Amino acid sequence: NEEVLFGGR
């Protein structure tokens, strides 16, 4: 999921 990839935000 995108949440995992962009967890830095």
Swiss-Prot record:
Conversion of fibrinogen to fibrin is triggered by thrombin, which cleaves fibrinopeptides A and B from alpha and beta chains, and thus exposes the N-terminal polymerization sites responsible for the formation of the soft clot. A long coiled coil structure formed by 3 polypeptide chains connects the central nodule to the C-terminal domains (distal nodules). The long C-terminal ends of the alpha chains fold back, contributing a fourth strand to the coiled coil structure. Disulfide bonds: none annotated. The keyword Lyase does not apply. It comes from the Eukaryota. One of its GO terms (biological process) is innate immune response. Its main location: secreted. The keyword Disulfide bond applies. It is found in: Secreted. One of its GO terms (cellular component) is extracellular region. Keywords: Adaptive immunity, Blood coagulation, Coiled coil, Disulfide bond, Hemostasis, Immunity, Innate immunity, Secreted. Cleaved by the protease thrombin to yield monomers which, together with fibrinogen alpha (FGA) and fibrinogen gamma (FGG), polymerize to form an insoluble fibrin matrix. Fibrin has a major function in hemostasis as one of the primary components of blood clots. In addition, functions during the early stages of wound repair to stabilize the lesion and guide cell migration during re-epithelialization. Was originally thought to be essential for platelet aggregation, based on in vitro studies using anticoagulated blood. Heterohexamer; disulfide linked. Contains 2 sets of 3 non-identical chains (alpha, beta and gamma). The 2 heterotrimers are in head to head conformation with the N-termini in a small central domain. This is Fibrinogen beta chain.
